[in-house]
């Protein structure tokens, strides 16, 4: 599995497998090594192919097997791909619960990680808004920390895009409350502009009110001047 050619050979066998015999054999052989293989430069591709081809029962066993190491795997440059593929293939409430519980305490750390942020974004894109509440709670609670980060500002925008109305207001409220510091940040100012572009009149008015007393100062600053200009349009 860790050999480039061996890995390709096994992937080809999985593609050719019409009766699930090969899939069953590979599953039994690698399940106990799945954590290590997911982070391997070649093994991760076999894991991805297996997750695509295996049965729901086998997939649940894989999710159970990696759940304790999911954060560690997600931060790995190879492992992140295998975790994203796993999230794409999730089918049962139990699988979703296991993934959610595994990631719950590390949302902000993953968002700020070069590889881990893609796992959080995959959850946002793939899972239902109510299944992603743990992400919305984390980014709302750590709003400034998330929004002023290179990866975090992008994740916050995706959260807003895929949230329910209630979740959207939860996030927008935190952005509004922290607007004065966010508009002065190289990344945070883009998120405030993004919220303004949503065209929610009451939110735009509240944001403008929060910034009004600091208008001259903000107009002279590199990042916040962009937000002031948008407010005036």
Which stretches of residues belong to each language-model region?
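Eukaryotic gene-expression regulator signature that favors modular helical reader/repeat domains
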Residues: 1-233
